[in-house]
Amino acid sequence: NKDKSRKKKKPKCIALATATAVSLEGTRESPLPASGSCEKVLQELQDTQQLGEPLVVTETQLSEQLLETEQNEDQNKSEQLAQFPLPTPIVTTLSPGIGPGHDCVGGASGGAVAGGCLVVGAGTDKTSELIPGKLESAGTKPSQERPKEESFCCVISMHDGIVLYTTPSISDVLGFPRDMWLGRSFVDFVHHKDRATFASQITTGIPIAESRGCMPKDARSTFCVMLRRYRGLNSGGFGVIGRAVNYEPFRLGLTFREAPEEARPDNYMVSNGTNMLLVICATPIKSSYKVPDEILSQKSPKFAIRHTATGIISHVDSAAVSALGYLPQDLIGRSIMDFYHHEDLSVMKDTYETVMKKGQTAGASFCSKPYRFLIQNGCFVLLETEWTSFVNPWSRKLEFVVGHHRVFQGPKLCNVFETSVSAKPKISEEAQNRNARIKEDIVKLLAETVSRPSDTVKQEVSRRCQALANFMETLMDEITRADLKLDLPHENELTVSERDSVMLGEISPHHDYYDSKSSTETPPSYNQLNYNENLLRFFNSKPVTAPVELDPPKVESSYVSSARGEDARSTLSPVQGFEGSGGSGSSGNFTTGSNLHMSSVTNTSNAGTGTSGTGNSGDGGGGGGADGTGSGAAPPVTLTESLLNKHNDEMEKFMLKKHRESRGRSGDKNKKSANEAMKMLEYSGPGPGHGHGIKRGGSHSWEGEANKPKQQLTLNTGGGGGGGGGGGGGGGGGLPLFLDVTHTSSSSQNKGPTGVAAGGAGGGVGGGGGSCSGLGGNGNVGSGNGNNSQPSTNQYTQSGLPCTQNINLWPPFSVGITTPTSVLSSHTAVPPSSFSPQHSLFPTFYYIPASIAASSPSSTNTNPNRPHKHAHVHSSSEKPSTSQAAAATMPLQYMTGVMYPHPSLFYTHPAAAAATAMVYQPVPFAGVANPMQLPEQASKNVYTTQPVMVAPPTATNKTQGAFHSITPAPPQRPSSQATSVKAETGSNVAPSDTSKKEVPDSPITPTMGDFTLDQPCNNNATTLKKYTDSNGNSDDMDGSSFSSFYSSFIKTTDGSESPPENDKDAKHRKLKSLDQSDNKIVEHPEEDQTQHG
């Protein structure tokens, strides 16, 4: 069976090859055939084989088709009839080369001989363009005797490179008998120097064919090779072996085809490669010259030669072959200098100099003088060349030179392909050396950097532009430096770690971290205002206590009238609450004033009414409860480190902006609120509220800085005001507990959380709200006082941002209180920034004289007009810049003789605090120290002694719980207050504070005991204890400012420990103060909006 199948396949293949040959011969002018016709014939052969029809029938059918196609060519017909009926002798030639392993020769794959055959179409250009569809039509052309073919075609299997078919014209072109190539490798007939070129064309052509879907007409490539001529007896006689082999140049057109796969009779699966066929159409290349020294016309074809800057030829057009006699591969890689006539080298040097000059302009070209060029047969042709070059735009180096050549005069020998016989011309040594030097000079010239004519001018212009740009940048820096500073605070990416450190009560987070954040904007101002410098400024400022506060807060009538604004004051943030403790009415005013600076803060706590006084503060907190209810449900109540960070960022931004304004244009910044600015500047205003303002004036910068973190706490607290209406507002009465912001955020101590809860809890602190979960969970303090149930925390929550007024404190240190105030007014909505400047700049604690405090503690929220010294102290500490007004309106009362933490602890609107401060009597800065102590006490005592605090909510002294300082006003302080004092030995509660409270002049007491002096402010403290003061902010401010100040300032006392607690409480207070703020907002929504606006 195998033998039979082989026999059948062989005739089929022969018939196919013959048919293809005939069709090619008959279609000289037709495009190269596609695989369609061949496949058609092959398919018919396969069909007949499958049907089991006799092979003779298949042969007959094929011959008939071919006859029809070549009707007009009798000679072709006779050849077909003779060859198709029986296997011709070619079969014997094929069989040896195709053994059993080459079954594909039988064309089982549809003409894919030898497994898969690549069809390479090589022949004349016309023949190579044959299209399968035109095979039949070609035969219709008038028949004439087949002329001597100029080209031939052959089919080669890509499986093994064997020639499967050749057209009869091969005999005319190369002299080989038609069947001599069959079964032999095509490469054997290619000149050895061109075999690499042929192989590279095959390897690159196959991928092209595959990528184009093996479309033969699309995958055609052309190249030139030398093919061997036949050495026959006719041409050379009998000495075949001794004669040299002659080669002739041919242009080959390659076309890849893929024959269709089909099942083999023996079930042998044909691989993809077996289907590839290569059709080659070979066309001989003739010399362009007819006569020696021929002068060619201007229309003669041009050819291009490209060489690199080193003179190495990199590309040659195939059109140059007939003109020069070199194949492209013969020239590529050689030096162009070797082909110039030695006498023309000087001319070529001039030409290349012009090339370099023209290279300065992209795309420029020029024609050079004619010069002589060596061709393959050893003669010279005269060339006219148009030169262009390409210069690398980045390196400005010449990449390559392209010469478009036209032969002006031909060689003496017309056949350019003859072997060169002439010997090299004799040249003297001197001439050779000169020529070598010229060649080297040309190469060096081409290697030079190409400079553009305009480069010099452009460089000069660029230098001038750069100098001008630098000059303008310098001017802009000087002119817009303040603006840049202002923009910086708005950035949201202030260093969180630094803020956190402040909140956590690190040693010197306030100023150092703030400086680092703002170092880019105002590095000098922040770097100069280091912590030690802030302390020195604070002490040197000798801030006046309550009496020093000016009426500028009063100027804001709404803030000034502490009595009429009782309710609003109760809603004020903790800072305001403290001021309001003396005259809780101020907290209402604070709402208005703070609204100017930070409308968001004050409005909320309006619900907590003027009862912000120490005793009434609890009531005020209750009023805030309504607002607190709204905010209490809000998750934000929980004070988290992230919220504190966010708040600190805002406060820091505000403080930076405020500081810039104060330094660059303190007057301009004050435009937003001239009254507030005046308040800030005149910290020693006569009004009781001035106590707060004085405190701010004395240490705006540090207070503002400290306030930042505290205000952040307040913001966090705002959410949790809940039922408590803000611990500070409800229970806080006049004395919101001061918790270290740091502690609150960390919530490591139970007291810190308790302070928060106090804001939420109805107790003296939270006013029954107790919803300040964010600050510290349930407020034990809150449970005690129903009076404090009013949610003043909301005020703090809403007004937490407004507390930014406190920021004014920070700039005042560096610039002046007035500037901080203006900054606060502009940044009213950003309480953290307002507090933080103060925080960072100055110690958290201020000492408030006991004498002033004594008068103020007597009156609780009941007497809104009468400012409590404690509240004043607190507001002064909290609002030296922004808190002054706020404190006046705030129900919080500062305890005389107690050091209160920075106003930033109280998350009250700095503006509101400032306004309130104006109204209230000036409170000694000792009050600031009190708040600082209070936070610790508050955090410790409030949690532990909350029941005691709750019991005396009516007593104004309960406010002490917030400040928790043992001051000469112990009577006001409830039993819980006493407990608080015990708990916070290092905080305001220290017993020694009582005596110090009496000394209003001392801004800061050396020990924590001094800070405790603000005990009188504790009227609200009992209920608020730590953060219970009218606005939980007090504690918050105390916490953040106190913690940092404590760590750096009061390491000897419990203060270091209390700051964390205070921070926690401060957070609680902030929440409470936010609730109170909400209440206030209800009372003075218009003012609040104005502030926010």
UniProtKB/Swiss-Prot annotation:
Query: Could you tell me what this protein is called?
Result: Period circadian protein
Q: Which residues cross the membrane?
A: none
Say which domain of life the source belongs to: Eukaryota
The gene it comes from is: per
Gene3D superfamilies reported in the protein's UniProt record: PAS domain, Single helix bin
Question: Which one Pfam family would you cite for this protein?
Answer: PAS
According to the UniProt record, what happens if one changes residue 886 to T? In strain: 0811.4
Q: What does this protein do?
A: Essential for biological clock functions. Determines the period length of circadian and ultradian rhythms; an increase in PER dosage leads to shortened circadian rhythms and a decrease leads to lengthened circadian rhythms. Essential for the circadian rhythmicity of locomotor activity, eclosion behavior, and for the rhythmic component of the male courtship song that originates in the thoracic nervous system. The biological cycle depends on the rhythmic formation and nuclear localization of the TIM-PER complex. Light induces the degradation of TIM, which promotes elimination of PER.
Ranges of Low complexity compositional bias?
A: 856-865, 1029-1048
What segments bear the compositional bias annotation Basic and acidic residues?
Answer: 1061-1093
Record note on modification = Phosphorylated with a circadian rhythmicity, probably by the double-time protein (dbt). Phosphorylation could be implicated in the stability of per monomer and in the formation of heterodimer per-tim.
